[in-house]
A protein has these predicted regions:
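Positively charged n-region of N-terminal signal peptides that target proteins for export
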Residues: 1-4
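Hydrophobic helical h-region of N-terminal Sec-dependent signal peptides
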Residues: 6-10
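Glycan-processing catalytic domains of CAZymes
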Residues: 19-269
Length: 269
């Protein structure tokens, strides 16, 4: 399964959660099915001992991955074990590997596509709201808002309509905070990007902005080449990152679980 990569170092939480979380992001992969229940439960307990309070599932469906009953059941068990260990749980919904490709469509085609995305997200939210032994503490829309395709107010109207509807309908399923992420790559002026974020925030969806301000720390070193490869940073460097605290009460998130020293020998990377 192709990686869905956070392309910048950190995320700034524009609209804060009800508490300043210290969270770890788990990007579920099919190969994680090899982890035993005992290994996973031990890993979740270790996260709590290290001071983490939140597990963020980046997605619960990725294209056709995690659509089979046995795959979903395993994700449910993993999430339930996290909450049993005392972690809060933010559930990522549907991730489309071709999300950015579809943004090049006409306005009408884009609106139709975003409606299909919303339907898929609602399906995941309903599924996870009804899952036994799980109470999601928040929802994550597994997509990224860039600063290229939504530069003009006219161009961003389909986006804002989608997010308005997503916040309202997902909250109808379970009244928990809804999140999405965004990144700045210099395609807009800083003031224009700020305005875009304000428009998104007005929909009621909380925005995690990848802006390099030290709220999410990458725990890996990416390899060179077109195909994504990565290995964990040295343990001492990771320990230094885990000791950091963000300013102004911002949430601190780390990407990702599989690169933590406590996950070595449990989750492949």
């Amino acid at each position: 399964m192709r990686k869905f990569i956070f392309v910048l170092l950190t995320l700034l939480l524009v609209s804060p959660f009800s508490f300043a979380m210290k969270g770890i992001i788990w990007q579920p992969q099919n190969r994680d099915s090899q982890v035993t229940d005992t290994q996973w439960q031990g890993l979740m307990s270790q996260l709590r001992l290290q001071g983490f309070d939140t597990l963020v599932l980046q997605w619960t469906r990725y294209g056709d991955a995690f659509t089979q009953p046995e795959q979903r059941t395993l994700l449910f068990k993993r999430a339930a074990a996290a909450q049993q260990a005392g972690l809060k749980l933010i559930v990522g919904l549907n991730a489309d590997p071709e999300f950015f490709m579809h943004q090049k469509q006409s306005s009408a085609a884009l609106e139709s596509y975003l409606n299909r995305l919303l339907a898929a997200d609602l399906q995941q939210a309903r599924l996870w709201s009804a899952a036994p032994g799980i109470t999601p503490d928040g929802w994550y829309i597994s997509a990224e808002i860039d600063d290229l395709n939504w530069r003009s107010e006219a161009a961003r109207q389909p986006l804002l309509t989608w997010l308005n509807n997503a916040q309202r309908l997902i909250s109808d399923v379970s009244a928990k905070p809804v999140y999405i992420s965004s990144f700045f790559a210099g395609n807009m002026s800083p003031d224009g990007y700020r305005q875009l974020l304000e428009h998104v925030k007005a929909t009621g969806v909380n925005v995690w902005v990848q802006d390099g301000s030290g709220v999410v720390y990458e725990l890996f070193v990416a390899g060179k080449g077109k195909t994504f490869t990565a290995k964990p940073k040295p343990d001492a460097e990771i320990a230094s990152l885990l000791a950091k605290r963000s300013s102004c009460g911002k949430d601190t998130l780390y990407f990702s679980l599989r690169y933590l020293p406590v996950a070595h020998g449990i989750l492949e990377y």
